[in-house]
Amino acid sequence: IRHRLQIIHSHGIKNVRVLDRTFNYNPRRAKELLRLFLEFSPDICFHLEIHPALLSEELKKELRQLPAGLLHLEAGIQSLREPVLEKSRRIGKLSDALEGLKFLCSLSNMETHADLIAGLPLYRLDEIFEDIYTLAGYRAGEIQLESLKLLPGTEMRHRADELGIRYSPLPPYEVLQTGEISVGELQTARRLSRLLDAFYNTPAWQELTRELILNDRRFLYRFLAYLTEANLIDQPMSLERRGLVL
């Protein structure tokens, strides 16, 4: 790996994405890789997906000591609901995941993005709104809301009938409906994702958007309704226009 990174470094590449979906599944290996990545600071930023429920104290110590800009983290939390995670057969306890996520979001030397997945079994639309509120309170660097996709050969696709999930037979095989979220509600979740990208995930407006979310639990509902009714949710807007809309 060191040799490959040396080649990458020699070509002036500034960003490397590690494709391991659970970088810290093996804490010892994760620690060794972090020390290897450190050799290429400040020239390369490494993008990792990390499981917040599997953060050992030793790994936390390593993360605290890293220089700013070395890592860009994605915490694949998917949902903040225990029944949803259990039904989806996600590893780790929710309490551990939340504790780990709070820790990651508190680090000033790296940015942590949190992912939620609409269309997971048992996951309701109102719970998605509540989870966004919680993540905003954690000060997540970005909140990314995606729709579940049932790729051929995956366990979730094999269990689709059992779980009451209807999905498109065509790529990208997006979930269309579950027992807990309707077709229309999934469309609302997609519009909510656009809202997050346009406002919360935009650095210029993140602090204001976070403050509005945390000061009023109904803000996201009302703001999304306004953007939809005004036909703004699918329209590209300049930074200045977004500020005026807020």
Where are these regions (language model features)?
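Conserved SAM/AdoMet-binding glycine-rich loop
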Residues: 1-121
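Short acidic (Asp/Glu) and glycine-rich catalytic loops that position anionic groups and cofactors
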Residues: 12-15, 42, 165-173, 204-207, ...
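Proline-aspartate-enriched helix->loop->beta-strand connector
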Residues: 13, 140-141
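Short secondary-structure boundary/capping segments
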Residues: 32-36, 89-93, 127-131, 157-165
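Catalytic cores of alpha/beta
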Residues: 58-63, 121-139
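Non-cysteine beta-strand/loop elements that form the S-adenosyl-L-methionine
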Residues: 60-80, 141-150, 156, 166-168
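Alpha-amylase-like alpha-glycosidases and glucanotransferases acting on alpha-linked glucans and related
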Residues: 98, 133, 161, 166-202
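Radical SAM enzyme core and accessory elements
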Residues: 191-246
